[in-house]
Amino acid sequence: MTIKIAIDCMGGDHGVSVTVPAAISFLSRHDDAEMVLVGLPDAIRTQLKKLHALDHPRVTIVEATEVITMDDPVEVALRKKRDSSMRVAVTQVKEGLAGACISAGNTGALMAVSRYVLKTLEGIERPAIATTIPNEQGWGTTVLDLGANADCEPEHLLQFARMAEAMVAVVDHKEHPTVGLLNIGEEVIKGNEVVKRAGELLRASELNFYGNVEGNDIFKGTTDIVVCDGFVGNVALKSTEGLAKMIGSMIKEEFTRSWFTKLLAAVAMPVLSRLARRLDPARYNGASLLGLRGLVIKSHGSADAHSFEWAIKRGYDAAKNGVIARITRAFADKSSAAGAAQPAPETEVPGAHPSPHVA
């Protein structure tokens, strides 16, 4: 089965200079992938020519005449830039011409455009942003929501947990992954009313609910999934990124302080290299917008080509493993109190029809 990925080539801080090389590199590693490169055709072709990939058989260029900048407000992205590379890329998913959309563009605009174009799945009130954060166990903890919903009701947190459970089950091949609810303590009496009520709903659900977890449990790998509202999740994510940068900077400073510390750095280099690979932020680039009728992956805006390629892989894995079908089934089962749930359709996306935007 061929997996087609739509790339918003113009998004992010670096645009085509990052997105196009990442797409071509990904194709060299995955024979069953195809790329739909969306954006300004001349800019895309210039990059392809530099990469000697102008006539690549698994690349299609789809024209978009506008670009959503990192500073554009949501209303501009939705109402004024209707032919933006971001919107056209998301539309490729809606029309079944691609299995996933990858964008490094403006997060607020991407969420708004994706929700407007794709709509939410049946039974899901709000989409959520989910990503993987490295942990001591080596596989990473899936955390959501990371900023899509600053305020949540208890039922939303339950929905987030179900969506993440479905994704982790098929992408990470973990049936019945454990779910933790981020709180200020493990005791059930702790937390605000929303969190306490969410805990009750999770305990009564079919999910493999571990209980309340604290911030340090994310890095311990206490549970496979950690659920929280978007305000808390975004603060946790940004704090993690800041701490990682600070530690890296401090280590570099200490090891370059004198000739002796430089010698120690040379001796410790094998260990430091292994640690750097385990904590490489590029490996964890790409946040999934869960709850939509199609796959959308948000890359970090400042990502380089190596990092953006990991975001492409996240979308590729989700499409190949049928994440949307799994989430659809999970919510169909929950809404079938009056009778047997209808099986969710397997939404494969080989891209059977030509796009009117093809350049």
From Swiss-Prot:
* Record note on quaternary structure: Homodimer. Probably interacts with PlsY.
From which organism does this entry originate? Cupriavidus necator (strain ATCC 17699 / DSM 428 / KCTC 22496 / NCIMB 10442 / H16 / Stanier 337) (Ralstonia eutropha)
Which Gene Ontology BP annotations are present? fatty acid biosynthetic process; phospholipid biosynthetic process
| Family stated for the protein in its record | Belongs to the PlsX family.
Listed EC numbers: 2.3.1.274
Pathway linked to the protein? Lipid metabolism; phospholipid metabolism
**GO MF annotation terms:** phosphate:acyl-[acyl carrier protein] acyltransferase activity
Report the protein name in the record: Phosphate acyltransferase
Signal sequence annotation: none
- Reaction equations catalysed: a fatty acyl-[ACP] + phosphate = an acyl phosphate + holo-[ACP]
